[in-house]
Each structure stands twice: as structure tokens, then as C-alpha cells.
């Protein structure tokens, strides 16, 4: 199992480009099932989760090629197998995103109940209940979801709770449904807007993405398109925190700052100096001058749960005390035990982590438990005294493209160790 070796103490400086957003790309890849025509993707990140989705589509009969411009071209016109098998689905919860597309276009889907990060319960009930309202028949058999429908029929759906993948799955199902579908209490994440823009570029009729209500007028078919994956706001936020905690000066290019206001506002409160350009963000911070900032996660436009672990590290290095509250997922403080092994002073009580700033950390062997926990351990290693070895880094490869290369380019002493 590969590991990352980090020797802390180096200030990060320089400019790097942000990769395409995994959380935007995955539903778009699932949506390629909705058309017979070719889809071309630019700026698709090279990540394990993307590879897993490729494997799922490929196992169904999709054709995936790479052109001379490094764009991915996908054709699902020859799909003949409508099953997403457990051996592929078990590593990634987003695998369920193929459910809506398969039922909408082919009338049948057999999807293994999903796996992914072990950060709490993320039920698929919202997906299944909404598909049932659209006219699908749902059965759970031997760990698989089986969905059938002759033709989905538009209707009003009020989600009982906010679900990003639930919103995306039903959007994809509804674009080919007969009549109008109105989705209420939907997720407002930028990636939901990205999916709507992508589907509309294929000929869908979707309005309201980014608000509490999405209106979808079904169409008979969708066409091919060319689409560039927007920048990953969570990757960008992670590198900005890395710059802040090392007392660095880093510029990120290919980034959309308006999507990151909730992150940037907290970084400013922590003492960072931030300059925003048309498609870039520059952050500088004096080492040792971090101010504590309370964090409370919430669905967009609130503070993203996917940045909670990174800001826990920032607060651990601050001058003062703070409270980090996790409102989105339970059991998402598994990184705390490992951070405390490096010298952090963090106490978890229920959904709150009480963080006392310690000023400095010490390198140690640590083990990643999920994607964002992996990122927090790497961040801690960047500013710790001595050597940190991060084990089980397959988690980080699910969501960060070439993280050791990008950090090395900025001046970090970080090396990937082979098995």
C-alpha cells in the first residue's frame, strides 16, 4: 500500500492550476448514458473515482477514448448491460448516479448498494422515493437496487432533506420524463448548477438550478456536446489552507472565486491576505499569526463539510481556541485521533470538535480514514517538525489529482513511497 512521506517546515510559494471538480464530473459522466451521441470532456481530472466511473460505464458497453488534446470522448450508444456491479460500486458512493440515467433512457437499472468513504450514513432513500414518484418500480434484492419503468412521468417532488446526489440523480431521470417535473428542497451546490448547464447543453430544459426549486420540462432525446469541467473548489480551498498554515504565498489559477466565498471569508478571518483576480486567487500569510475561526458546516451556500477537516488543522495551529461543528455528516471527526498523535489538542463531543491552538506539531506515522481526513493529515505534515508518513493514501487519490506533484512544485518536501 502506497504512502506519502512529508518533511515539514517549508513555506509554500508559487502558482498552480486547479484541476476539474470531481463532484461536478461524476454526475456528468453518469449523464452520458442519456444520449446516443458522443460527449467530449475537457479538464476532466485524473482521479481514482473518475477511473471507477469509467470502469462502470465500460462494463456496460460504453466506449471511452482520449484524443490528441487530452480530451475524453465518451459514447454510450452501444450500452447493453444495465448493471453496476458490487466490485466496482463498493469503493464509491457516487456510483448510484447512473441509476437515474439508466432508468430514464433504458427502462431498467440494477445497481449495487453503494460504498465509498466511511463517514456516516448517507441513505439512498431520497433517490428511490423520488424515482418511485416518477413512475419507476423499485426492488431491493440481495444487496442490489433494481429499478424498472416503461416511461417516467413528470411530477412534483419535495425532498425530505437536502441531498446533492439525490438532486442530481432525479434531475437526470426527469430530463427524459414525459411532462414537467418540479423538484423542491433541492441541493444548491455549484456542482448541481454545473450538471444543469451540462444537461442543457445536450438539449435538456432545466431552470432554477442553484435555487430551492428546479423545474425540468422533459424532452424526447438529448444530443452530444462538448463541455469543460469547472475547477474544484474543494481542491482550491485545500491548497489555500496549505499556504496559510505554512506561512506561504500561493496563487491558484483556473479557479472560480465566487463559488468559494464561504471558504475565503473564513480564511480572511484567520488572518490571511487574499487577492482575487478574474480566474485566480492569491493568498499570503505570516507564519505563526493564525487566528482561530469557528466553523459550522452546512449545505451550500454554507461552509462545506468537505473543508471541515482542513480547517480543523488550521485551527489547531492558531493562537487561541475554536469550535468546529459538523452538521452534515455524523462520524466525520475520524481524523482527530491521528491529528492528536501529531500534537494537536482537539476534543470531540458529539457534533462538535473543541480545538485549542498549539502553535506547532510533530511529525508521526498516521493513517488516513477517508478522503478529506487524508488531506488534513497531509496539511498537518507540511508544517510539523520532522517526518510524517501518511498511510492508506488511496483515499487521497480518489479526490486530489497529483497532490504530491502540486505540493512539491510549491516547495513542499513530499514523496510518494511505493508499496
Residue ranges and their predicted role:
Residues 1-419:
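Short, structured segments at the rim of ligand-binding sites
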Amino acid at each position: 500500500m502506497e504512502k506519502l512521506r512529508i518533511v515539514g517546515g517549508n513555506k509554500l510559494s508559487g502558482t498552480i492550476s486547479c484541476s476539474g471538480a470531481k463532484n461536478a464530473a461524476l454526475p456528468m459522466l453518469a449523464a452520458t448514458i442519456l444520449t446516443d451521441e458522443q460527449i467530449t470532456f475537457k479538464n476532466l481530472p485524473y482521479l481514482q473515482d473518475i477511473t471507477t466511473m469509467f470502469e462502470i460505464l465500460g462494463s456496460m458497453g460504453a466506449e471511452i477514448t482520449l484524443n490528441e488534446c487530452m480530451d475524453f470522448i465518451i459514447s454510450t450508444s452501444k450500452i447493453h448491460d444495465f448493471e453496476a456491479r458490487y466490485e466496482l460500486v463498493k469503493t464509491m458512493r457516487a456510483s448510484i448516479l447512473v441509476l437515474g440515467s439508466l432508468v430514464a433512457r433504458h427502462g431498467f437499472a440494477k445497481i449495487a448498494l453503494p460504498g465509498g468513504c466511511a463517514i456516516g450514513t448517507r441513505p439512498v432513500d431520497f433517490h428511490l422515493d423520488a424515482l418511485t414518484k416518477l413512475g419507476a418500480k423499485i426492488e431491493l434484492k440481495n444487496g442490489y437496487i433494481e429499478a424498472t419503468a416503461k416511461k417516467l412521468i413528470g411530477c412534483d417532488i419535495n425532498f425530505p432533506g437536502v441531498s446533492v446526489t439525490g438532486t442530481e440523480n432525479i434531475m437526470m431521470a426527469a430530463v427524459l420524463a414525459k411532462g414537467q417535473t418540479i423538484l423542491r428542497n433541492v441541493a444548491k451546490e455549484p456542482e448541481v448548477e454545473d450538471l444543469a448547464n451540462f444537461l442543457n447543453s445536450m438539449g435538456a430544459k432545466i431552470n432554477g438550478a442553484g435555487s430551492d426549486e428546479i423545474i425540468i420540462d422533459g424532452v424526447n432525446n438529448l444530443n452530444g456536446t462538448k463541455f469543460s469541467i469547472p475547477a474544484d473548489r474543494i481542491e482550491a480551498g485545500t491548497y489555500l489552507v496549505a499556504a496559510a498554515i505554512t506561512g506561504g504565498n500561493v496563487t491558484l489559477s483556473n479557479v472560480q472565486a465566487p463559488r468559494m466565498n464561504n471558504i475565503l471569508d473564513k480564511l480572511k478571518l484567520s488572518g490571511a491576505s487574499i487577492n482575487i483576480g478574474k480566474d485566480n486567487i492569491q493568498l499570503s500569510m505570516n507564519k505563526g499569526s493564525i487566528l482561530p475561526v469557528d466553523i459550522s458546516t452546512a449545505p451550500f451556500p454554507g461552509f462545506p463539510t468537505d473543508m471541515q477537516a482542513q480547517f480543523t488543522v488550521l485551527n489547531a495551529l492558531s493562537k487561541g481556541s475554536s469550535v468546529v461543528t459538523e452538521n452534515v455528516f455524523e462520524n466525520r471527526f475520524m481524523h482527530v485521533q491521528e491529528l492528536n498523535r501529531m500534537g494537536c489538542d482537539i476534543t470531540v463531543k458529539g457534533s462538535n470538535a473543541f480545538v485549542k491552538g498549539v502553535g506547532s506539531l510533530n511529525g508521526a506515522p498516521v493513517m488516513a480514514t477517508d478522503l478529506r481526513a487524508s488531506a488534513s493529515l497531509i496539511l498537518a505534515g507540511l508544517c510539523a517538525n520532522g517526518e510524517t508518513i501518511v498511510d492508506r493514501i488511496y483515499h487521497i487519490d480518489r479526490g486530489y489529482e497529483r497532490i504530491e506533484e502540486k505540493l512539491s512544485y510549491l516547495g513542499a518536501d513530499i514523496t510518494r513511497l511505493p508499496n
